[in-house]
Amino acid sequence: MVENIGSGSAELVSYAKLNLYLDVLGKRSDGYHEIVGLFQTISLHDTLTVEICDRGFYLESSVALPSDNTIKRAWEMFRKNTGKEFGLKVTLKKKIPVGSGLGGGSSNAAAVLRYLGEVFKIPLEDLLNIAAQVGSDVPFFLYGGTALVRGRGEIVEKLEDIEGYSVDLFFPGIHSSTKEMYLSLTPEMYRKGPGRVEELHRAYLERDYEKIRKLSYNVFEKVFLEKHPEVMDGLRNFGDGSIVKMMTGSGSAFFALYPLDKGNYSFVGGV
């Protein structure tokens, strides 16, 4: 979502995501892992104020970010792929925890790419190509809502948006490294999920809670809890009465799924 706020600035909303399903199918020859997942945006969001300038990149953030952050990479890859020469000023108000598996960095990058695409009239197909160069989850965030995601994350099939659900989140304050979590996987862990992602999507649409519980899966959850057994204490008191409780992404956040309005954050539709 883009809102013009005057003086050449625009305010962007950057939503978090959940992995309602996430499995790793194997390791590819290029070093990436082949995944399959059901992704869903939720109402937890960061806010970015952006302004195009003559030259340079300027970022003011409410939390510390690395110098090679995803917002800067989005700006660099956009310029490289389009040949457009311009600078960018960004103010980021962060609400999505860093290292939580909620996709905040990828969502920030996608919000900037979507805005630049509107300004410079770049087609979505070209933006998707740029997004894949910025990060594996970035293409999904150009769509948002509900999607089946494959490949290393760059193959996105938009699905009918799931509505009528909400979640509570548990963040144990641990920064979970995506790279380390993938390195912790062994071939025996691949393809262990039910694999019926389309069926899980239908179960959400049909409010089949029993099937949702049966088909939900995250390959990283067991690995994460083995690395951080202390998290179990907090999880015992989290998500009472929920439909399902599970980890998102490569951690460290967990979500508890409820019917609409019972959780703090609602499912958000896509573009």
From Swiss-Prot:
Q: Where does ATP bind?
A: 97-107
Q: In which pathway does it act?
A: Isoprenoid biosynthesis; isopentenyl diphosphate biosynthesis via DXP pathway; isopentenyl diphosphate from 1-deoxy-D-xylulose 5-phosphate: step 3/6
Source organism's superkingdom? Bacteria
Sorted alphabetically, the keyword list is: ATP-binding, Isoprene biosynthesis, Kinase, Nucleotide-binding, Transferase
Task: Write down the chemical reaction(s) this protein catalyses.
Answer: 4-CDP-2-C-methyl-D-erythritol + ATP = 4-CDP-2-C-methyl-D-erythritol 2-phosphate + ADP + H(+)
- Please state what class of enzyme this protein is: transferase
Q: Decide whether keyword Nucleotide-binding is in the record.
A: yes
Q: Which residues cross the membrane?
A: none
| Assigned EC number | 2.7.1.148
Q: Which InterPro entries match?
A: GHMP_kinase_C_sf, GHMP_kinase_N_dom, IspE, Ribosomal_Su5_D2-typ_SF, Ribsml_uS5_D2-typ_fold_subgr
- Short name of any one Pfam family annotated for the protein: GHMP_kinases_N
- Catalytic residues per the record? 17, 137
The biological processes this protein is annotated with in GO are: isopentenyl diphosphate biosynthetic process, methylerythritol 4-phosphate pathway; terpenoid biosynthetic process
Q: Which GO terms of the molecular function aspect are on file?
A: 4-(cytidine 5'-diphospho)-2-C-methyl-D-erythritol kinase activity; ATP binding
Homology family = Belongs to the GHMP kinase family. IspE subfamily.
Question: What does the function comment of this entry state?
Answer: Catalyzes the phosphorylation of the position 2 hydroxy group of 4-diphosphocytidyl-2C-methyl-D-erythritol.
NCBIfam families per record: ispE (TIGR00154)
State the name under which the record lists this protein.
4-diphosphocytidyl-2-C-methyl-D-erythritol kinase
Q: Organism source for this protein?
A: Thermotoga sp. (strain RQ2)
